[in-house]
Amino acid sequence: MAPKFFGIEHILYLIISSGVASAALLLAKKYCKTDRQIKVFFKCFAALSLVVVVASRFAQALCFGGPRWYMLIPDSYCAMTSLVLALAVLLGKKNNPVLHFVWLLGLFGGVSTAIYATFLGQNPSFFFPPTILGLLHHSLTATLVVALLLFKQIDVTYKKWHYTLFGFTCYLTLGAFMMQVFPISDAFHIAEPLIPGTALTSWVMAPMYAVGYALVLLLVELIKKRNARKCGNQK
Protein backbone atom coordinates (compact mmCIF):
# COMPACT_ATOMS: atom_id res chain seq x y z
CA MET A 1 0.00 0.00 0.00
CA ALA A 2 1.33 3.42 -0.98
CA PRO A 3 2.09 5.92 1.79
CA LYS A 4 -0.86 8.17 2.55
CA PHE A 5 -1.07 11.90 2.90
CA PHE A 6 -0.86 12.43 6.67
CA GLY A 7 -0.41 8.70 7.12
CA ILE A 8 1.91 7.31 9.78
CA GLU A 9 5.06 7.63 7.62
CA HIS A 10 4.24 11.20 6.67
CA ILE A 11 3.48 12.26 10.24
CA LEU A 12 6.67 10.63 11.53
CA TYR A 13 8.66 12.37 8.82
CA LEU A 14 7.20 15.76 9.75
CA ILE A 15 7.92 15.22 13.45
CA ILE A 16 11.48 13.98 12.91
CA SER A 17 12.40 16.56 10.26
CA SER A 18 10.98 19.42 12.34
CA GLY A 19 12.90 18.20 15.39
CA VAL A 20 16.18 17.84 13.50
CA ALA A 21 15.78 21.24 11.84
CA SER A 22 15.00 22.95 15.15
CA ALA A 23 17.94 21.27 16.88
CA ALA A 24 20.30 22.21 14.05
CA LEU A 25 19.23 25.85 14.16
CA LEU A 26 19.49 26.03 17.95
CA LEU A 27 22.97 24.48 17.93
CA ALA A 28 24.10 26.77 15.13
CA LYS A 29 22.78 29.82 16.98
CA LYS A 30 24.57 28.72 20.14
CA TYR A 31 27.96 27.82 18.68
CA CYS A 32 28.33 29.92 15.51
CA LYS A 33 29.39 33.29 16.89
CA THR A 34 32.02 34.69 14.54
CA ASP A 35 31.49 35.70 10.92
CA ARG A 36 33.74 32.87 9.78
CA GLN A 37 31.80 30.26 11.76
CA ILE A 38 28.50 31.55 10.38
CA LYS A 39 29.90 31.53 6.85
CA VAL A 40 31.11 27.93 7.18
CA PHE A 41 27.73 26.87 8.58
CA PHE A 42 25.84 28.36 5.64
CA LYS A 43 28.23 27.02 3.01
CA CYS A 44 27.93 23.50 4.46
CA PHE A 45 24.15 23.77 4.74
CA ALA A 46 23.83 25.05 1.18
CA ALA A 47 26.11 22.29 -0.11
CA LEU A 48 23.95 19.65 1.59
CA SER A 49 20.80 21.20 0.15
CA LEU A 50 22.37 21.30 -3.31
CA VAL A 51 23.35 17.62 -3.15
CA VAL A 52 19.81 16.63 -2.14
CA VAL A 53 18.05 18.67 -4.82
CA VAL A 54 20.42 17.41 -7.53
CA ALA A 55 19.85 13.84 -6.34
CA SER A 56 16.11 14.54 -6.48
CA ARG A 57 16.40 15.62 -10.11
CA PHE A 58 18.33 12.46 -10.99
CA ALA A 59 15.60 10.45 -9.27
CA GLN A 60 12.97 12.23 -11.37
CA ALA A 61 14.98 11.51 -14.50
CA LEU A 62 15.67 7.83 -13.83
CA CYS A 63 12.85 6.37 -11.72
CA PHE A 64 9.85 6.74 -14.01
CA GLY A 65 10.29 4.35 -16.90
CA GLY A 66 13.81 5.01 -18.06
CA PRO A 67 16.19 7.92 -18.56
CA ARG A 68 14.52 11.27 -19.18
CA TRP A 69 17.59 13.47 -18.99
CA TYR A 70 15.65 16.66 -19.63
CA MET A 71 14.10 16.17 -16.18
CA LEU A 72 17.46 17.09 -14.66
CA ILE A 73 16.31 20.66 -15.29
CA PRO A 74 13.80 21.57 -12.56
CA ASP A 75 10.33 22.14 -14.02
CA SER A 76 8.55 23.32 -10.86
CA TYR A 77 8.77 26.40 -8.65
CA CYS A 78 9.85 24.42 -5.60
CA ALA A 79 12.56 22.37 -7.30
CA MET A 80 14.03 25.36 -9.12
CA THR A 81 13.86 27.50 -5.98
CA SER A 82 15.65 24.82 -3.96
CA LEU A 83 18.41 24.74 -6.59
CA VAL A 84 18.69 28.51 -6.96
CA LEU A 85 18.66 29.13 -3.20
CA ALA A 86 21.37 26.55 -2.55
CA LEU A 87 23.58 28.03 -5.28
CA ALA A 88 22.91 31.60 -4.13
CA VAL A 89 24.02 30.79 -0.58
CA LEU A 90 26.92 28.57 -1.64
CA LEU A 91 28.37 30.93 -4.26
CA GLY A 92 26.95 34.32 -3.33
CA LYS A 93 27.52 36.82 -0.58
CA LYS A 94 25.34 37.78 2.36
CA ASN A 95 22.13 39.57 1.31
CA ASN A 96 22.79 39.00 -2.40
CA PRO A 97 20.00 39.92 -4.87
CA VAL A 98 19.00 36.33 -5.65
CA LEU A 99 18.04 35.75 -2.02
CA HIS A 100 15.46 38.53 -2.24
CA PHE A 101 13.65 36.62 -4.97
CA VAL A 102 13.74 33.12 -3.54
CA TRP A 103 13.45 33.50 0.23
CA LEU A 104 9.65 33.68 0.47
CA LEU A 105 9.12 31.12 -2.30
CA GLY A 106 11.51 28.77 -0.53
CA LEU A 107 9.92 29.24 2.87
CA PHE A 108 6.29 29.00 1.78
CA GLY A 109 6.87 26.34 -0.87
CA GLY A 110 9.09 24.24 1.36
CA VAL A 111 6.74 24.21 4.34
CA SER A 112 3.48 23.87 2.40
CA THR A 113 4.73 21.08 0.15
CA ALA A 114 6.30 19.09 2.99
CA ILE A 115 2.94 19.25 4.78
CA TYR A 116 0.67 18.95 1.73
CA ALA A 117 2.79 16.31 -0.02
CA THR A 118 0.49 15.20 -2.82
CA PHE A 119 3.24 13.08 -4.41
CA LEU A 120 3.37 10.56 -1.55
CA GLY A 121 1.26 8.00 -3.40
CA GLN A 122 3.50 7.70 -6.45
CA ASN A 123 5.07 4.45 -5.18
CA PRO A 124 4.32 1.83 -2.47
CA SER A 125 7.55 2.70 -0.67
CA PHE A 126 7.91 5.88 1.38
CA PHE A 127 11.63 5.67 0.58
CA PHE A 128 11.08 5.63 -3.18
CA PRO A 129 13.86 8.09 -4.22
CA PRO A 130 11.62 10.74 -5.84
CA THR A 131 9.36 10.69 -2.77
CA ILE A 132 11.89 10.89 0.06
CA LEU A 133 14.28 13.19 -1.81
CA GLY A 134 11.39 15.47 -2.72
CA LEU A 135 10.39 15.76 0.92
CA LEU A 136 13.98 16.33 2.00
CA HIS A 137 14.77 19.09 -0.45
CA HIS A 138 11.59 20.97 0.48
CA SER A 139 12.42 20.65 4.19
CA LEU A 140 16.03 21.70 3.74
CA THR A 141 15.06 24.71 1.66
CA ALA A 142 12.56 25.95 4.24
CA THR A 143 15.09 25.43 7.04
CA LEU A 144 17.79 27.24 5.08
CA VAL A 145 15.52 30.26 4.66
CA VAL A 146 14.74 30.28 8.39
CA ALA A 147 18.48 30.16 9.08
CA LEU A 148 19.09 33.10 6.74
CA LEU A 149 16.51 35.15 8.60
CA LEU A 150 17.70 33.99 12.02
CA PHE A 151 21.32 34.96 11.33
CA LYS A 152 20.33 38.16 9.50
CA GLN A 153 21.97 37.02 6.27
CA ILE A 154 19.17 38.72 4.34
CA ASP A 155 17.67 42.14 4.97
CA VAL A 156 14.08 41.82 3.78
CA THR A 157 13.01 45.16 2.30
CA TYR A 158 10.50 46.57 -0.19
CA LYS A 159 13.39 48.36 -1.92
CA LYS A 160 14.38 45.09 -3.61
CA TRP A 161 10.92 43.91 -4.70
CA HIS A 162 11.95 44.10 -8.38
CA TYR A 163 14.16 41.03 -8.00
CA THR A 164 10.98 39.01 -7.51
CA LEU A 165 9.56 40.28 -10.80
CA PHE A 166 12.80 39.45 -12.60
CA GLY A 167 12.95 35.99 -11.03
CA PHE A 168 9.37 35.08 -11.95
CA THR A 169 10.02 36.24 -15.50
CA CYS A 170 13.04 33.93 -15.70
CA TYR A 171 11.04 30.98 -14.34
CA LEU A 172 8.19 31.45 -16.80
CA THR A 173 10.57 31.97 -19.72
CA LEU A 174 12.39 28.75 -18.86
CA GLY A 175 9.07 26.94 -18.47
CA ALA A 176 7.84 28.08 -21.89
CA PHE A 177 11.17 27.01 -23.42
CA MET A 178 10.98 23.57 -21.82
CA MET A 179 7.42 23.04 -23.05
CA GLN A 180 8.52 23.83 -26.59
CA VAL A 181 11.73 21.80 -26.62
CA PHE A 182 11.03 18.79 -24.38
CA PRO A 183 8.17 16.25 -24.50
CA ILE A 184 6.31 17.71 -21.52
CA SER A 185 2.86 19.27 -21.38
CA ASP A 186 3.57 21.67 -18.56
CA ALA A 187 6.35 23.39 -16.65
CA PHE A 188 6.06 25.84 -13.76
CA HIS A 189 2.28 25.38 -13.93
CA ILE A 190 2.00 27.50 -17.05
CA ALA A 191 -0.60 25.21 -18.63
CA GLU A 192 -1.78 23.00 -15.77
CA PRO A 193 -2.95 24.06 -12.28
CA LEU A 194 -0.97 23.42 -9.14
CA ILE A 195 -3.96 21.57 -7.67
CA PRO A 196 -6.04 19.58 -10.19
CA GLY A 197 -9.54 20.91 -10.65
CA THR A 198 -8.64 24.46 -9.65
CA ALA A 199 -7.63 27.56 -11.61
CA LEU A 200 -4.24 27.80 -9.89
CA THR A 201 -1.99 28.14 -12.91
CA SER A 202 0.95 30.55 -12.86
CA TRP A 203 -1.24 33.25 -14.38
CA VAL A 204 -3.47 33.12 -11.29
CA MET A 205 -0.82 32.34 -8.69
CA ALA A 206 1.59 35.10 -9.75
CA PRO A 207 -0.82 37.97 -8.89
CA MET A 208 -1.81 36.19 -5.67
CA TYR A 209 1.85 35.80 -4.73
CA ALA A 210 2.51 39.46 -5.56
CA VAL A 211 -0.25 40.56 -3.18
CA GLY A 212 0.97 38.19 -0.46
CA TYR A 213 4.57 39.33 -0.94
CA ALA A 214 3.51 42.99 -0.72
CA LEU A 215 1.68 42.31 2.54
CA VAL A 216 4.74 40.53 3.96
CA LEU A 217 6.98 43.46 3.00
CA LEU A 218 4.50 45.90 4.57
CA LEU A 219 4.49 43.87 7.79
CA VAL A 220 8.30 43.79 7.83
CA GLU A 221 8.49 47.57 7.40
CA LEU A 222 5.98 48.14 10.20
CA ILE A 223 8.01 45.89 12.51
CA LYS A 224 11.22 47.73 11.59
CA LYS A 225 9.65 51.11 12.34
CA ARG A 226 8.26 49.90 15.65
CA ASN A 227 11.66 48.53 16.68
CA ALA A 228 13.34 51.76 15.61
CA ARG A 229 10.92 53.77 17.78
CA LYS A 230 11.62 51.49 20.74
CA CYS A 231 15.37 51.95 20.32
CA GLY A 232 14.88 55.71 20.09
CA ASN A 233 12.80 55.80 23.26
CA GLN A 234 15.38 53.75 25.15
CA LYS A 235 18.10 56.24 24.25
Label every PLM stretch briefly.
Residues 30-42, 90-99, 151-162, 226:
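Membrane-interface helix-boundary motifs at transmembrane edges
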Residues 14-25, 78-90, 137-151, 205-221:
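Hydrophobic cores of alpha-helical transmembrane segments in multi-pass inner/ER membrane proteins
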Residues 54-55, 83, 111:
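Hydrophobic residues within the alpha-helical transmembrane core of Major Facilitator Superfamily
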Residues 55-65, 115-125, 181:
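Juxtamembrane "helix-exit" motif on the non-cytosolic side of transmembrane helices
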Residues 65-77, 124-134:
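Non-cytosolic membrane-interface motifs at loop->transmembrane helix junctions
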Residues 1-44, 49-55:
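N-terminal topogenic module of multi-pass integral membrane proteins
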Residues 87-151:
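Membrane-proximal helix-loop-helix units in multi-pass membrane proteins
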Residues 2-16, 159-170, 178-218:
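Membrane-interface transmembrane-helix boundary segments in multi-pass integral membrane proteins
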